[in-house]
């Protein structure tokens, strides 16, 4: 990267295209090494310069890098917009493969599994034309996401793993879904967000897991407040929180009182289910990003997660203490890695909204 920076600085005002090509090459290295901050504006300017001077191939490649960066940091609308403005026919086979992989990645994050399969088929064809074994392996790895459990369905006291296409089907059904991946209660196109109200979501999940049975007041107090002891103050607080929860979900379900506690009664739905993450891990989103096998800086993780670097650093320290991640390097050069977790895909652990309707 430093050599490319020096080369870019060495080109004079009349060599703007050469300078722009160096910026694009530097951005590609930064993307691979997960240095995601500060490259967006420079890359956009380089792409504009290349387009202005008729270098359509390198301009398209720069646009593809922009789309890949947006996908990595979870800005799916921008990634989709960049792809829409690119003509894959201008790209060589290797870059066409990358274009299709970005399209597949966006589709998976949006739970559009048919579109993801179509994009992966295009990626496979382009990879074969490119004749690069590593690229073919990347396409095969991306395709395995569709064949790997992405979530768990908890219903009637039992649970089973779900593939992405099954998650898509559950969300499109008339089931009342307590979505523990995005912390909402939903049925069809109606969504009640509870991410900022953890007590109410804890009640929702407990009632959803037990449906059609009820949940005792003592069990709800444990789930919602983390208290093993039950006294009159806890019972009074539970009544207040159940009232708030009842008001929030009224369009979708009733919350009925029973002799020993409360039960969920979906409106117009056949049954209630809970869509749970494939693993219960406090810092699951951090692990999901690291699971791509690349080494990430804490600043890049913070950018991708849309949170503060301090929050990410605390999560990394906790994961390192638990032996789930490893540190590489020191100071500003420090990077973090983890081994991919076998047995499930991390798509639903990433901070992207699920489809609303």
Predicted region positions:
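A short acidic, leucine-rich amphipathic alpha-helix
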Residues: 219-222, 299-304
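Short, cationic-aromatic polyanion-contact patches
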Residues: 263-280, 330-353
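Tandem amphipathic alpha-helical repeat scaffolds
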Residues: 18-35, 58-73, 98-110, 138-149
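DNA-binding patch around the recognition helix
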Residues: 231-273, 317-333
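Tetratricopeptide repeat
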Residues: 3-7, 39-46, 79-86, 116-123
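Positively charged, aromatic-enriched patches within helix-turn-helix-type DNA-binding elements
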Residues: 203, 207-237
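Short boundary/linker motifs that mark transitions into or out of structured domains
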Residues: 136-201, 205, 247, 251-282, ...
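Short coil/turn linkers that connect adjacent helices within long alpha-helical scaffolds
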Residues: 9-17, 34, 49-57, 87-95, ...
